[in-house]
């Protein structure tokens, strides 16, 4: 089975988010974690999502990794390229979303592409080209305080244009999207006739995403958040195997929960876990830097906690003021690296001790943990929350993982994940 759709995602949780949407829409989907090596076999699936860690990478590195991933997918038979970024368009005015999209356009021969990070189920909508997080414009939402990609402008055309060297970015508004796929295609043609090659597309609900999916049929390249994953599988109607696309093997056992995200959503989830009596140990990056806290010590605590509880959470999660204080002391890059390295080492110790269920919060943390565990392929299972599925390694002695973007999930996400674990 050769993939019909090949996706290049700029972080690990974003990749699982998209894979979740594709599986929900009926495509048998496999996640390929990390930059692929040329010559590696492309997994047999209807959709393959290559999960990179390029969201905050320098432009040349992000472009190179993304092109390598797409070439690998294309050589494996993928017919359409889907460049997946965050539903909050995480980047900076000098970020890499525009350059990666431009490079993929050239590689795929696309003369036009769309940008639609909307994910209405998670409160991310676009109106008149402005991105909203629930009722708040992006620049008024907690994303304005993101430690790596503070989002200070909700106008996606204005945010994207500098990344494209000042190229004009068009808009296909909700009034057009409401009219369906034919109207969207006509708007695309009108923009192309004016020499405009890039356009933001409004989306306020799943019907809009499905219409955009139909309008995107046959396009060499689309760029979007995960939401468009609901609309695209239908364009391959008649070519899909059908049946359940999200079945996983039974795994069982206790779960280790690791949280490196400092988003407002994850802070609330950690607080709720603690309030509900969940086993919790807060990791202090300063203590790790000073040698007063170690991965070995953290795992010792977790292993003891898991003797009496179905799940134990180690969290480096802190509110924005505390994050800034740590970054001022250690530097932003060192602080992030300490968290990722320490939680990854704890995960390695847990796996060696027989733990086969992991729940991880934070895109960078998820990437670090899966890399440390040597996991390169994941089958996609049932949804825990919008954008977050359970996944499992392929082969004997499977390990189950839930990889959560920091911003996703209800306050009870950790409890919900634990209760639904395979």
Locations of regions flagged by a protein language model:
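N-terminal basic/disordered segments at the start of proteins
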Residues: 1-43, 64-66, 118-121
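Cap/lid and interdomain-hinge subdomains that line or gate substrate/regulatory clefts
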Residues: 2-4, 46, 59-62, 70-209, ...
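Short acidic, glycine/serine/threonine-rich loops at helix termini
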Residues: 18-20, 93-97, 124-132, 183, ...
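Glycine-rich, highly charged phosphate/nucleotide-binding loops
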Residues: 35-38, 58-72, 342
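A structural-propensity feature for long, helix-poor, extended segments
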Residues: 46-54, 308-310, 392-422
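Conserved, well-structured core segments that form the ligand-binding/active-site neighborhood
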Residues: 134-301
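C-terminal structural cap/anchor segments
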Residues: 302-305, 309-361
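Conserved, well-ordered active-site substructure
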Residues: 355-356, 364-413
